[in-house]
UniProtKB/Swiss-Prot annotation:
Recorded superkingdom: Eukaryota
Protein localization: Cell membrane; Endoplasmic reticulum; Endoplasmic reticulum membrane
Signal peptide residue numbers: 1-22
InterPro entries per the UniProt record, alphabetical: OligosaccharylTrfase_OST3/OST6, Thioredoxin-like_sf
Pathway the protein takes part in: Protein modification; protein glycosylation
Residue numbers on the Extracellular membrane side: 23-177, 233-257, 315-328
Cytoplasmic compartment spans: 199-211, 279-293
Function: Accessory component of the STT3B-containing form of the N-oligosaccharyl transferase (OST) complex which catalyzes the transfer of a high mannose oligosaccharide from a lipid-linked oligosaccharide donor to an asparagine residue within an Asn-X-Ser/Thr consensus motif in nascent polypeptide chains. Involved in N-glycosylation of STT3B-dependent substrates. Specifically required for the glycosylation of a subset of acceptor sites that are near cysteine residues; in this function seems to act redundantly with TUSC3.
Protein name stated in the entry: Dolichyl-diphosphooligosaccharide--protein glycosyltransferase subunit MAGT1
Gene3D superfamilies listed in its UniProt record: Glutaredoxin
Residues with attached carbohydrate: N64
């Protein structure tokens, strides 16, 4: 009977020993991975990864940290303009986190270039770039862990909101100082001051109705075409299909747009406006009847042509819209 407690103790040690050793080995592997990531982050805010690094540090357990990965194609022969623009914003976000007082080892920023890790693209069945995915500390990425680039754009502030939503890590985006705005404002003030100085005795140009009307028209066209949305969201200029090479300038959803789409809509609105101006001049001017007829026909043609195109763009974004005019 005295040997029974000793036997039980031996059995417990025999069962718990391997488990404890495995747990200790797991903690050592995790510590090595975190130390390696921290060392790379201290040198570069965005860690460049190939297939081996991605599988070992992002996919393979154990892991108690989240990794935000940008899948991109930055090599010049890929001709991915959007990738370069998105990379600049991603670098701003990663640098803001790296130099933040709240920096911890709970989240890291990484990048996989197609030419350095094409096997990773194949493993994830990924066929477009740039793409942002959050690999959480526990479990596999869910649907919300893939960033909706076409809807939100790639501005660092938008990425920071998405990161906060997926990881509960709030990053205050700090951009490098941009002196372009103050310089342009100073140049504008200098031009205005120069005009006032040179024509101080004659300021009739300030009361020029045509000039003010043209300036107001430019402002209205810019605002109605979606320039302010672009400024806030920072969408890509266009989207190039990596397989077919086809470039899309019109976004297929009503919830997003490309910068090129703004320029197209501005052009169409400008064409309609020009047509209306010609119709007004044809009806009110004192020119001979022949010229007024030409202006009237040209005005009607511009309004019909550009309005049809504008309605066609609207139909392509709002699927199921029943009305069209000349163009489907």
């Amino acid at each position: 009977m005295a040997a029974l407690p000793v036997l039980v103790l031996v059995l417990l040690l025999a069962c718990g020993g391997p488990r404890a050793a495995g747990q200790k080995r797991k903690e050592m592997v995790l510590s090595e991975k975190v130390s390696q990531l921290m060392e790379w982050t201290s040198k570069r805010s965005v860690i460049r990864m190939n297939g081996d690094k991605f599988r070992r540090l992002v996919k393979a357990p154990p892991r108690n940290y989240s990794v935000i990965v940008m899948f991109t194609a930055l090599q010049p022969h890929r001709q991915c303009v959007v990738c370069k623009q998105a990379d600049e914003e991603y670098q701003v976000l990663a640098n803001s986190w790296r130099y933040s007082s709240a920096f911890t080892n709970k989240i890291f920023f990484a990048m996989v270039d197609f030419d350095e890790g094409s096997d990773v693209f194949q493993m994830l069945n990924m066929n477009s770039a740039p793409t942002f995915i959050n690999f959480p500390a526990k479990g596999k990425p869910k649907r919300g862990d893939t960033y909706e680039l076409q809807v939100r754009g790639f501005a660092a502030e938008q990425l920071a909101r998405w990161v906060a939503d997926r990881t509960d890590v709030n990053i205050r985006v700090i951009r490098p100082p941009n002196y372009a705005g103050p310089l342009m404002l100073g140049l504008l003030l200098a031009v205005i001051g120069g005009l006032v100085y040179l024509r101080g005795s004659n300021l009739d140009f300030l009361y020029n109705k045509t000039g003010w009307a043209f300036a107001a028209l430019c402002f209205v066209l810019a605002m109605t075409s979606g320039q302010m949305w672009n400024h806030i969201r920072g969408p890509p200029y266009a989207h190039k299909n990596p397989h077919t090479g086809q470039v899309n300038y019109i976004h297929g959803s009503s919830q997003a747009q490309f910068v090129a789409e703004t320029h197209i809509v501005l052009l169409f609105n400008g064409g309609v406006t020009l047509g209306m101006v010609l119709l007004h001049e044809a009806a009110t001017s004192d020119m001979d009847v022949g010229k007024r007829k030409i202006m009237c026909i040209a005005g009607i043609g511009l309004v019909v042509f550009f309005f049809s195109w504008l309605l066609s763009v609207f139909r392509s974004k709002y699927h199921g819209y029943p009305y069209s005019f000349l163009m489907s």
